[in-house]
Amino acid sequence: LNIIENNEVFYAMKSFTFFMHNIYAMGGTVKSVTQLANTLAEKGHPVTIISVFRGADSPYFELHSAIKVKVLVDYRLKLKNTRAITANRIKKYTPFLNTKVISQFEPGKSQFSSYVEKKMIKAIRHTKTDVLVGTRASFNILISKYAKAEIVTIAMEHMNFDAHPDQYQKEIIAAYRNINKITTLTVADQQKYQSQL
């Protein structure tokens, strides 16, 4: 974005927010998000990572010092985390804390409760950023519903489209019509999305 003011050009660096499962865990998605976030931060972009879960003191991979990390649910054994830990335990024994909005096809659905879901939706609704990047199909679906209209939304896919059940594929396609951009793992997946969107 170029801003012309008094015959000078100022470059307003776009802010990026990544909405992801757990920046504190090991995994391919974590590694790719870390690399991209670090590159953006090195170029001067304000970068925030919203990590739904936290179970360790430090992110698994080293993050640029300018990157902000916001945690929604902290599972470390500390007194201040009692509510989150208790909600997660109780969910296993009662249907009252089942999710209402997260897709039933989310592969890790057992990790989510209505308590976690509410925190996720609130975070998406209140995120102030130029670009919001979802890193999981179910997260992208939530972003398509709850992100502010002025935010550029990106669905970063880390699974092949055909790996999803047929019903989930339909749910994804319907939601992604409200997403601005999609990144895919393969050219074949790119073509599948382009043919349906």
Each PLM stretch: what is its role?
Residues 21, 74, 136-137, 157-160:
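Histidine-centered beta-alpha loop that forms part of the nucleotide-sugar donor binding/catalytic region
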Residues 113-116, 134-139:
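Short His-centered aromatic/hydrophobic patch
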Residues 118-126, 161-184:
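Membrane-proximal helix-turn-helix segments that form the acceptor-binding/catalytic region
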Residues 13-17:
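Extreme N-terminal starter segment of soluble prokaryotic enzymes
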Residues 130-131, 152:
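Structural motif
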Residues 141-143, 180-197:
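A short, active-site helix/loop in glycosyltransferases that binds the activated sugar's phosphate group
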Residues 20-26, 39, 43-106, 194:
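N-terminal strand-loop element at the rim of the active site
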